[in-house]
Amino acid sequence: MGHKVHPIGIRLGISADWNSKWYANKAEFAGYLAADLKVRQVLRKKMSQAGISKILIERPSNAACVSMHVARPGVVIGKRGEDIEMLRKQLSDIMGVSVHINVIEVRKPELDAQLVAESVAQQLERRIMFRRAMKRSVSNAIRLGALGIKISVAGRLNGAEIARSEWYREGRVPLQTLRADIGYGFSEAHTNYGVTGVKVLIYHGDIFSFSSVGQEKQDDGSRGDRNADRSSRRSREVR
């Protein structure tokens, strides 16, 4: 059942947060949504060499804030900040308000699901064997502290006539545990044989407090007491 829904969408408000944060009435909603999609499309196309992990968009009153999580911030900023200033003007024209850009560096790209997916896709485009690409990315993630990782590729693998899917996993990837901090990434490799899809799931641990929805932090002792209470209630019901 864990594969039937989007792993981030089902966790929104529980252990994951929204990528766009703003309020709009009926008349403005469609315009804001179209502008957000256009901004993401422009950034991923223009800054494809920067290694973009995710793009967060916020709209305070009469302004906008775009936060980019990238592996190579120097590509975005450019020489003496010239590139980021040109990018800010372009985004201001798209959104129609003043735009502030934050560039946040991803310290460990081997633990970022989106960057891992793009890395595997790039290796497939360079005709590297898909099993070697998957195992290399999995071993790097586990070595740097990931509790679990799963990579799946689908398409005409190694130029086969019939498309198929293959996956490789190490550690735990609890898809049905909503408190699990799971990163999800997807990318496509455009090869001579067609398009190959790459999906990556990385498990970082459990989240017991999520500030965006005001949940209180729970320690292991309280969880143990609560589980003991549940088991005692079940035993009484059985009797």
From Swiss-Prot:
GO terms for molecular function: mRNA binding; rRNA binding; structural constituent of ribosome. InterPro entries: KH_dom (IPR004087), KH_dom-like_a/b (IPR015946), KH_dom_type_2 (IPR004044), KH_sf_prok-type (IPR009019), Ribosomal_S3_C_sf (IPR036419), Ribosomal_uS3_bac-typ (IPR005704), Ribosomal_uS3_C (IPR001351). HAMAP family: Ribosomal_uS3_B. Signal peptide: none annotated. GO terms for biological process: translation. The gene is rpsC. PANTHER family: 30S/40S RIBOSOMAL PROTEIN S3, SMALL RIBOSOMAL SUBUNIT PROTEIN US3C. NCBIfam families: rpsC_bact. This is Small ribosomal subunit protein uS3. It comes from the Bacteria. Residues 39-107 form the KH type-2 domain. GO terms for cellular component: cytosolic small ribosomal subunit. Residues 214-239 are annotated as: Disordered. Residues 216-239 have a biased composition (Basic and acidic residues). Part of the 30S ribosomal subunit. Forms a tight complex with proteins S10 and S14. Belongs to the universal ribosomal protein uS3 family. Keywords: Ribonucleoprotein, Ribosomal protein, RNA-binding, rRNA-binding. Binds the lower part of the 30S subunit head. Binds mRNA in the 70S ribosome, positioning it for translation.
